[in-house]
């Protein structure tokens, strides 16, 4: 189930053996994945935002909250905290290696997140209710659009669009994810 209808990026180079690349593509296709070809740097930028940053955030949130709890405060931790920090349960050694291998792209993703948090902090400091509501509304809207896109028909269409764009070399990343339009 993990790889069924998942997007799998294969990052071959000019020096890659075509037969080997074909075997790798066949492997992922056999697992039910939709294989696309991307340059390594593009792949690294995408996974830094979509996979690595969430893992970093889960660990940072766990460290920031659990590392500062006083006796009895853990009783206040609910399902939101549980769900948000689930990714921190991953192998620390594996995530150390991933972070070391993709440090530059992860740093950029963190910079972008810090800019968002700075905007939020400024709005909180100024008690700007409208800015705060817009911040949370945007987060809600982006998530709803993403969830809606997970439905099979639209997901398959987006995968087809992403594949076509990647093959044309026309893959643009926007601040909040991939431009699917």
Pin down the residues of each PLM region.
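An alpha-helix initiation/capping motif
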Residues: 40-47, 51, 133-137
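Charged, alpha-helix-enriched surfaces in structured cytosolic catalytic cores
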Residues: 19, 41, 79
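Substrate/ligand-engaging "lid" and interaction regions
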Residues: 46-84
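Interdomain hinge/lid region at the active-site interface
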Residues: 72-143
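Rossmann-fold dinucleotide-binding core
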Residues: 1-35, 44-47
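Short, structured loop/turn "capping" segments at alpha-beta junctions
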Residues: 33-39, 57
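NAD(P)-dependent dehydrogenase/reductase Rossmann-like domain
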Residues: 117-181
């Amino acid at each position: 189930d993990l790889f069924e209808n998942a997007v799998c990026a294969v990052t071959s180079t000019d020096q890659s053996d075509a037969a080997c690349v074909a075997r790798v593509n066949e492997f992922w296709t056999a697992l039910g994945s939709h294989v696309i070809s991307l340059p390594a740097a593009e792949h690294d930028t995408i996974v830094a935002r979509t996979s690595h940053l969430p893992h970093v955030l889960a660990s940072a949130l766990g460290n920031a909250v659990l590392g500062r709890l006083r006796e009895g405060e853990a009783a206040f931790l609910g399902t939101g905290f549980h769900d948000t920090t689930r990714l921190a349960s991953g192998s620390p050694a594996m995530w150390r290696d991933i972070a070391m291998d993709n440090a530059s792209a992860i740093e950029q993703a963190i910079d972008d997140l810090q800019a968002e948090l700075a905007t939020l902090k400024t709005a909180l400091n100024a008690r700007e209710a409208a800015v705060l509501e817009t911040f949370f509304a945007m987060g809600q809207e982006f998530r709803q659009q993403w969830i809606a896109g997970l439905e099979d028909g639209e997901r398959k269409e987006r995968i087809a669009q992403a594949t076509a764009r990647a093959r044309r070399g026309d893959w643009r990343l926007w601040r909040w994810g991939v431009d699917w339009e």
